[in-house]
């Protein structure tokens, strides 16, 4: 599901809400998650999961086109860990 599809589904489930309000709400939630991660803080949504940053060590990679070694710097990457409720609901599928 894309962000656009999520917005369309929420609009269909809540016809009394203005489309712009739903769209702004989804965008605001995602923006706040990103801003919190930029500050190296963790975002926890109980039952759903948590977003955090994981550190990746510097390493030597390979250019897939040429096969040449490339030095990759250390970096932080976003990480999502599913919560208990989400894991249980997905396991039923």
UniProtKB/Swiss-Prot annotation:
GO cellular-component term (any): cytosol
PROSITE patterns noted in UniProt: HISTONE_LIKE
Any GO molecular function: DNA binding
Keywords (A to Z) from UniProt: DNA recombination, DNA-binding, Transcription, Transcription regulation, Translation regulation
Function as written in the Swiss-Prot or TrEMBL entry: This protein is one of the two subunits of integration host factor, a specific DNA-binding protein that functions in genetic recombination as well as in transcriptional and translational control.
Family: Belongs to the bacterial histone-like protein family.
PANTHER family in the cross-refs: DNA-BINDING PROTEIN HU (PTHR33175), INTEGRATION HOST FACTOR SUBUNIT BETA (PTHR33175:SF5)
Subunit annotation: Heterodimer of an alpha and a beta chain.
Name of the protein this chain belongs to: Integration host factor subunit beta
Annotated organism of origin: Haemophilus ducreyi (strain 35000HP / ATCC 700724)
Gene label: ihfB
């Amino acid at each position: 599901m894309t962000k656009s599809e999520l917005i369309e589904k929420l609009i269909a489930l809540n016809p009394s809400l203005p489309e712009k309000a739903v769209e702004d709400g989804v965008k605001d939630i995602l923006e706040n998650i990103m801003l919190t991660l930029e500050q190296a803080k963790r975002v926890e949504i109980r039952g759903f999961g948590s977003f955090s940053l994981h550190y990746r060590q510097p390493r030597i990679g390979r250019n897939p086109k040429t096969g040449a070694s490339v030095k990759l710097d250390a970096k932080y990457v976003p990480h999502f860990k599913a919560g208990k409720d989400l894991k249980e609901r997905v396991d039923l599928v």
